């Protein structure tokens, strides 16, 4: 048996090839799986459950069917933090806390999206703090649909422009934040996404940090079993 972790698919109507690749993943990679964990940014943007695109609703129906035979867990990312209970229920997904600890085949493991550890990006962390307030999210949800979409498009555009000007270091997790989370949770293993830099980092103290990759050019999945971890790339070309 094995547990699968994915993240940063950034699904959108503009990149249906990624959705197709994800559907192939759902067809071929879930045999003997104990669970599927989606570590945020499943969608490129999410302005509200009431504005879900047709492709997202179709995907929800697919995930709902799969959830009848294995649990699907979801942690919010920085692009889909407005994804709510309505869509999660439709997709058969259980929304987990931002930082979640679990026992993975005897290894205490902390899982998260990962953006909270990019502490050198001060501007983003200010925005992240604002969006963490339930009142701010409620206020946004009360806006007309067109206004919500316009705000989301503006934030997305500003984020893409800003990221092009930020250094490699600022866009990565801060080592001190990683150390602090290990100390806070008393876990020996960490799994996250967000940075789009798939890797397995082994520490001298025996801890391990695993970063799942994005799905822009190829798929990425972390397979965890009693035998260890395997970070796999999944070519989009099904042939």
From Swiss-Prot:
Record has Phosphoprotein as a keyword: no
InterPro entries: Calcineurin-like_PHP_ApaH (IPR004843), LpxH-like (IPR043461), Metallo-depent_PP-like (IPR029052), UDP-diacylglucosamine_Hdrlase (IPR010138)
Pfam families: Metallophos
EC supergroup of this enzyme: hydrolase
Cofactor: how and how many bound: Binds 2 Mn(2+) ions per subunit in a binuclear metal center.
Pathway this chain belongs to: Glycolipid biosynthesis; lipid IV(A) biosynthesis; lipid IV(A) from (3R)-3-hydroxytetradecanoyl-[acyl-carrier-protein] and UDP-N-acetyl-alpha-D-glucosamine: step 4/6
Signal peptide, first to last residue: none
Sites where the protein binds Mn(2+) 2: 41, 78, 113, 194
Principal localisation: membrane
Enzyme Commission code(s) on record: 3.6.1.54
Reaction it catalyzes: UDP-2-N,3-O-bis[(3R)-3-hydroxytetradecanoyl]-alpha-D-glucosamine + H2O = 2-N,3-O-bis[(3R)-3-hydroxytetradecanoyl]-alpha-D-glucosaminyl 1-phosphate + UMP + 2 H(+)
Gene Ontology CC terms: cytoplasm; extrinsic component of plasma membrane
Cofactor: Mn(2+)
Binding site for Mn(2+) 1: 8, 10, 41, 196
Subcellular compartments: Cell inner membrane
Family, as annotated: Belongs to the LpxH family.
Name of protein: UDP-2,3-diacylglucosamine hydrolase
């Amino acid at each position: 048996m094995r547990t699968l972790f994915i993240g940063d698919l950034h699904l959108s109507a503009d990149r249906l090839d990624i959705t197709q690749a994800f559907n192939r993943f759902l067809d071929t990679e879930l045999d003997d799986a104990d669970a599927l964990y989606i570590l945020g940014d499943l969608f490129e943007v999410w302005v509200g459950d009431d504005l879900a695109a047709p492709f997202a609703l179709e995907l929800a129906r697919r995930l709902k069917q799969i959830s009848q035979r294995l649990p699907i867990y979801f942690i919010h990312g920085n692009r889909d933090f407005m994804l709510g209970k309505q869509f999660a229920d439709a997709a058969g997904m259980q929304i987990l806390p931002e930082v979640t600890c679990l026992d993975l085949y005897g290894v205490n493991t902390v899982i998260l999206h990962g953006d909270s550890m990019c502490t050198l990006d001060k501007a983003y962390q200010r925005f992240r703090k604002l969006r963490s307030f339930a009142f701010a999210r409620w206020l946004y949800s009360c806006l007309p649909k067109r206004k919500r979409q316009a705000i989301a498009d503006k934030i997305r555009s500003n984020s893409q422009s800003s990221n092009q000007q930020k250094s490699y270091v600022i866009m990565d997790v801060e080592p001190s934040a990683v150390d602090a989370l290990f100390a806070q949770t008393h876990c020996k293993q960490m799994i996250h996404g967000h940075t789009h830099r798939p890797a397995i980092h082994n520490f001298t103290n025996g801890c391990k940090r695993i970063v799942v990759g994005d799905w822009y050019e190829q798929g990425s999945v972390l397979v965890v079993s009693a035998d260890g971890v395997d970070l796999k790339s999944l070519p989009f070309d099904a042939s």
